[in-house]
Amino acid sequence: MGSQARYNMFKIFNPEGCVKQLDFIRQTTELGGTAVGLKNRSVGVLIAHNERRSRLADIQKKVFSIDRKSLFTFSGITNDGLQIVDYLIDKSVREEVIKGRAIHFLDVFEDLLRDVFERTILDGRRLYGVSGLYMTEYDGIRLVEFNPKGHVREVKGMGIGCRAQSSRTVLEAYCEEYEKMGVEELVRIGIMALKNAHPEDDALTGENVEIWILEAGKAVYNIDAKVFLN
């Protein structure tokens, strides 16, 4: 009997040097729609590509408003992503109603990460099959990457989903200049990153690309992608 068959029931040990379940989850998130986020101190931009998999399917929403000053997008299993959206909305409302303040951009994931950690090390429960980007205003604009392995980190820019590494290449090339940029310039960098991941003609259209903006002191809003894709 091969080692893979003998050790498949274990979550945190495999003699081949990798945890198969975590590898499967990584592959799942990389099959999802591409999304990029980038920000400076006063402006944040989230751009998501939602490719239509079938002519019969409607294009679904990819960027979700958590509250007036927070956004979340994800790549991977849709039900898992929507579960995290509901979780973030609930945490935001509880913090505002009970404590009268905005929730910390990393602490908001505390309960979720505990659940992710338990799913990772204990057998019998399915792992989260989704990665995400959370943007909010908390002493400036903040961008946080959520990883299905059970950790979050603050970033200046990040790409997730299908061909995400190609989008990150562009984001990394301009990251030192983000602080000098306004809304339009940041959006153009984000579109450039998305095009690097999807260079095919007509891959990006006004119908399958969402652009959302968060400016310090203002509520989140979206803009027409056609303006930047033409």
From Swiss-Prot:
Pfam families: Proteasome. InterPro entries: Ntn_hydrolases_N, Proteasome_alpha, Proteasome_alpha-type, Proteasome_sua/b. The keyword Nucleus applies. It comes from the Eukaryota. The keyword Nucleus applies. PROSITE patterns: PROTEASOME_ALPHA_2 (PS51475). Its main location: cytoplasm. It is found in: Cytoplasm; Nucleus. Gene3D superfamilies: Glutamine Phosphoribosylpyrophosphate, subunit 1, domain 1. Keywords: Cytoplasm, Nucleus, Proteasome. The 26S proteasome consists of a 20S proteasome core and two 19S regulatory subunits. The 20S proteasome core is composed of 28 subunits that are arranged in four stacked rings, resulting in a barrel-shaped structure. The two end rings are each formed by seven alpha subunits, and the two central rings are each formed by seven beta subunits. The catalytic chamber with the active sites is on the inside of the barrel. The proteasome degrades poly-ubiquitinated proteins in the cytoplasm and in the nucleus. It is essential for the regulated turnover of proteins and for the removal of misfolded proteins. The proteasome is a multicatalytic proteinase complex that is characterized by its ability to cleave peptides with Arg, Phe, Tyr, Leu, and Glu adjacent to the leaving group at neutral or slightly basic pH. It has an ATP-dependent proteolytic activity. This is Probable proteasome subunit alpha type-6. The gene is PRE5.
